[in-house]
Structures are given as structure tokens and as C-alpha cells.
Amino acid sequence: MSTNPNTPAPPASRTNPISLRIYKAIGTSFDDVSSREALEIASGMYGPEDPKAKVKAQPEYEELEEDDDTLPKRRTLKGQSAAIARKYLKQDIETCLATGSTKFLEAFAEVDQKLNVLREHMQEMQVRCDQVQSELDQANSGTKFLLERADVLRSQRDSAQLRAHLITLFLSRFTLSNSELTALTSREVTIGQPLFDALDHVEKIRTDCEVLLSGEEGKAQAGLDIMSLTSEQLESGYSKIHRYCQFEFRQFTREAQLEASSVMRQAICRLRDRPALLADAIQTLTSTRQSSILHQFLDALTRGGPGGLPRPIEIHAHDPTRYVGDMLAWVHQTTATEHEFLEGMFGVKEKKRWVGQERGGEEGEEERMASEVLDKDLEGLSRPLKLRIQETIKSQEGIIMTYKIANLLHFYLVTMRKTIGGKAMLVQTLQEIHDQAYIAFYETLDAQGRGLLRFLHPPDATLTPPITLRDAAQILRELLFVYSTSLIDPAERESDADLAKLLDKAVGPCVEMCERMAEMRRGKSGGGEWERDIFMVNSLGYLEHTLEMYDFTTKTLHMLDEKIKTHVESMTFEHHGKLLESCGLAAVMRTIRTRPEDTPLSRLHATSPKSLTSALSKFSTWISTVDPSTSPRLALLTSPRLAVEIHRKALRKIYDAYGEICERVLDKAEGYEFGETMLRRGRDEVGVALGVGEDWELEEDTEEKSMKQKEQQDEDTEDQGEKGIMQEEHKAQDAGNTEDKA
């Protein structure tokens, strides 16, 4: 019968001691380290005898042996280990424990003996320590005062060191070093960056000292002492800078030496904090530069440059424009050089403004100082320059030369005003000379106008502009040419008061002279208004042609054009009357204009059918002989355009008169029975014959434009010739000036 091992045992076996022991043995685990170690020790105690050992007679039981490790070692026979172990295990273990305890007791006895010896030594050492402590206590009680004194001295030393450190910091902050004091006070140390750094340090000390002044009484007194000391140091430093500036300013006597170093610029900048010292130093500079510039100007006038080049300015005293121009050019060049030097010395910031360019905006402190010094430097030039230019102006008799000098003065006045400002004394002097020059010019111009009106005579038979008018127009042309070269903005020339005054004084007497001469011609020859109008149109046209060369004479041209139009209208009216008489329609038109309203034209004598037929026959003959483009009566007009215009307007009025006559003849109310047969020519046919048909206005405008273009071309050719002559003259003068200046 087979039994399943997994089948649980019956309940009776669970109470069996053997079964329980077996289950206990089976269930016991010997995997832990301590159990294994115990088993290994036990197995070592009862191990079999080495077979290679010497064989002796063995008793029935084995004797107990002990090894060096106090563990019992029994010799067993082969196969008896387990039995011996079960028999003697408890006994052997107890024996082992007893043996081990004995050894421990022996060892502890020896240790106890050693500890007794150590205790004796410790007791002896304790006695010695007590003696030392007693002596130490006696020493401490004897040196207590010294220790306390040492602690007090140590604390005092630390306090003194702290105070010394604070004093060192205080002195380093509120006093100057030896090198800084030397830089401020010693004459052997030159002006430089160390001096400026020392001044900055003094200023910083004074700023920091304000904290002390607002503190306690002791601190406030220290602050006052520091402020007093630093004030003396500052004054010493500024005095040194002041002496340096005065010395350097006295060296600026020649143009080659005009160069301001960075140290000089910074020194002047520092002296601004002491206005009195700066003013005194600048006074030295202005007196030095004023004297130097004046001597240079006199040398340029009388001695010329080094080696004789350029030549002395007074050599050209015979040429007024060059003489005055050279003096003003020298002054302007010197002004530019001096202005550049002063701007560099005073540290004016660069604003990209060229010399002569207009000054803009508010000036800074540096620019104001530079302008004031420049004004004083150039002050010495005012008197000699003024005397020489005034003498030159007074010696001139020609109006052109006087105006050239005045215009030259105006050019440099505008330039200098933009460079150094209008308040400078030199500019005011130039303004005074400029005003005097213009006064002299206007006086000469007035004298010329009075001369034109003093000796008048009737125009000649050609009715051309008189020679006096031509001379005056030539002078006016040259004056306007000089004016066109001025610095006045072209957009402002039309409103320039000086130009208006010039044109009024130059053109007014000419027009008045022509009007008086025309009246004399009318009274002498009996030509009436016709010759007067022709002479006035020719003369005014000549003046107008003179002014047309320049675009800034619009107002005067408009005035002359209005006068010319008035005379042209008068001539047109008179010419129409003459043509109306010659064509035979004058009596007819007078009757039409003056007839009673209730009377037909056919019943009036001048417009009766017979008289009207005769008049129309004469008109038909006249129209075949008349020249529609010009008339011999207008041959004396110097302007072909105006002659054609007057003639064509008169013919147009003839055409209109003939048209009105045709309307009256064809009107049944006028009483003409055969009106169509009376009119030999139609209205359009007359218009074509006279050249004044329906398209007359368009043709007239076209012809007028062509005539104007032709006249303008002729005038431009003449103007170019005259301008070329004037430009050649000016070029020749400029070439001479350039050659001498070279």
C-alpha cells in the first residue's frame, strides 16, 4: 500500500514525543550564521583522528584534550563522533566555561594589581597638582593688579589706535598732500594737471566740510578752520594761474604765436570762478593783441609783407575800390584768424558754423567771452580804417566809384556782422562809414539829377532819347550792375529800401527831364501832343530797356510801363483821327455821333446819299493804298512793336467805324433806299484789306509776341555786349588785385 508523502499524519501521531522531536528537528533552521558557527565549533571538538598520525592502542573511550583556544578536543574513533558528542557535549561545554572563567579571574587579578599601582601614582599626582594650584592661586592673587592694569592699557591702546586711524582718515579727506601743496604754492612747479587736480581736491574738501559746519560746536570749529585754510590754498592756486595767464598772454604778439594749448584753455576755464582775476588777465590779452593788430595793419599799409610781398596797400591808393577793398579784406582776414584763435582759447564748442556764416541762437558763456575779447582786440583798427576810407570817399567825384565803394562797404558790413555780431565796435564803425558812403553817393546822385534839369533844350527832329538821358541811363546801368553783385538775398532785393531810393533818385529826374523837354518841343514846333508822345515813348522806352536787364526793378518798370501806355493810348487816338480824316469818313462819323435822335442820317448834309457815296468812294480808294503793317507817321518811334500796335489799333477803329456805317446804311430807319449799292466793299473785305478782320486779336497777339521776341533778342544782344564790357573791366581790376596780392 503506497502512502502519499503530502498526506497529513493522523491526530495520534501529533502527541507522540518522538514525532514531536522529529518535527522539531526537521523544522529547526540552521541557516543563520551563529548556528553554523556553533555547529562548526562542535564538529571541531569531536572530529575524527588523522589517519596519518601514529597509531596507538585506543581505549574504550576517548580522553579529553584541550587546544590552545580553550576548546575541548576529544579524540574519537572513526564513526564514533556523534555518539561521543551526545555523551560529553554538556560536560565539555561546562568544563570549557570553567576553564575560561579561571583564565579571566587570573587576568583580572593581574589587572587589579596594576590598577592599585596606578591609583597610588594618581594620588601622588593629585598631591602635586594641589601644591601647584596652591602656588598658582598665590601668584594670581599677587598679580591681579598688574593684570587689571594691563587690561586697561590694552583697551587704551586699542582706543588710541582707532583714534589714530580716524585722524589719519580725517586728515586724508580734509587736508592736502605735500605734492598738492607744492603744486598750489611753489613757483618752481609749472602749471599743469597736478595743479588742477589739487584745486579739485580743495573744492571737494570744502564741499565735504559743510557737514562739519552743521554739526556740534567742536566739529563746527574744525570745519571753520578747514574752510579758512582751504580758502587760502584756493587763492594761492588761483593767483598762480592768474600769473601764468598774464605771462602767456604777453607772448601773443605775432600771428605765428597764436596757438592756445590745452593747459591755457583749462587755466582760463578755472579763472571763471574768479571773475576779477579773469578780467585782469583778459585785459592784458586785449591790450597785447590790440597793439599787435594795429601795428600789423599799419605795416600792411606802409611796408607790406616780409620781403616786400604782398606789396603795401597804400601803393594802390590811386585805385579807390582796390585800396578800400584791400584794407577791408585785410581786416576781414585778421578778424577770421583772431576769431578762430579766441574760440580755440576759450574752448568754444564746434557747431559747424563757417566764418562769415550768420550767427544763430543764444550765445553760450564761451562765445560771449570770445566775442567781447575779439571786439576789444579789433577796436584799434576802427580809427585808422575810418579815416582812410572817409578820405577816399570824399576825394571821389564820380558817382559810379562812390557807389562801388559804398557797395563794397555794404558787402563787408554784412560779412562782419555775421562773423562778430552787430554790437561790435568795428561793425559799428563800418556801419558809420557805410552810412556816410551812401550819403555821399546819394548827394552825388541828387547833384546828377539837378544837373539833368538845369540845362534843358527841346528834343531834336528825330525825337530820339537825348544824349543826357543816354548818359544817365548808362550810369544807372552800371549802378544796377554793381548792386546785382551785392550780398543781398535776391528774394529781398525787390523790397530793399536802398534800391528803391536809388531808383527813385536816378529814374525820377530822368523822367522829369523828358517831360520838360517834351513840353518844350510841343511849344516850339507846334507839333502838339503827337511829337510829345513820340518823344516820351522813345525816352521812357529807353529807360525801360535799361531796367529790364535786372529782375529786381519790377516796381519801377511797372511805373514806366504805365506812363508809356498812357502816351500810347494818346497816340492811338490821334493816329486814328488822322487816318479817319485821310480815309474820308471823319465827317460821316462826326455826324453819326452828333445827330439828333429823331432825324434820319439820310436827311443830314454830311450823311446824305450823295455825300455818303462820295465819302465811301474816297474810302475805297484809300483802303487800296494804305499799308496795314505800319505808317510813316510812326517812323520816329524807336520801338517797332509799339508802332505796329498803335497802327493796328487805329486801323481796327477804322474797321469798326466802317462796320457801324454799314449798319446805319442798311438800316431802313435811316432812309437810304439803295443802301446795298452805296456800299462798294463789304465789311469783311475791308477787314481783310486792313488786316484787322475777325481774327485780328489772335493775329495781333501772335505778331506782338514775335515783335517782343525780336526786340528782346536785340536788347539781349546789346545787353550782353554792355555786360561783357563791364565784366571785362571788373575782371581786369580783379586780375590786378590778384596779381598784387600774390
Curated annotation (Swiss-Prot):
It comes from the Eukaryota. Keywords: Golgi apparatus, Membrane, Protein transport, Transport. It is a peripheral membrane protein. SMART domains: COG6. Residues 694-703 have a biased composition (Acidic residues). The keyword Methyltransferase does not apply. The keyword Protein transport applies. GO terms for cellular component: Golgi membrane; Golgi transport complex. Its main location: Golgi. It is found in: Golgi apparatus membrane. Residues 720-742 have a biased composition (Basic and acidic residues). GO terms for biological process: intra-Golgi vesicle-mediated transport; protein transport. Residues 692-742 are annotated as: Disordered. PANTHER family: COMPONENT OF OLIGOMERIC GOLGI COMPLEX 6, CONSERVED OLIGOMERIC GOLGI COMPLEX SUBUNIT 6. Belongs to the COG6 family. Acts as a component of the peripheral membrane COG complex that is involved in intra-Golgi protein trafficking. COG is located at the cis-Golgi, and regulates tethering of retrograde intra-Golgi vesicles and possibly a number of other membrane trafficking events. This is Conserved oligomeric Golgi complex subunit 6. It comes from Cryptococcus neoformans var. neoformans serotype D (strain JEC21 / ATCC MYA-565) (Filobasidiella neoformans).
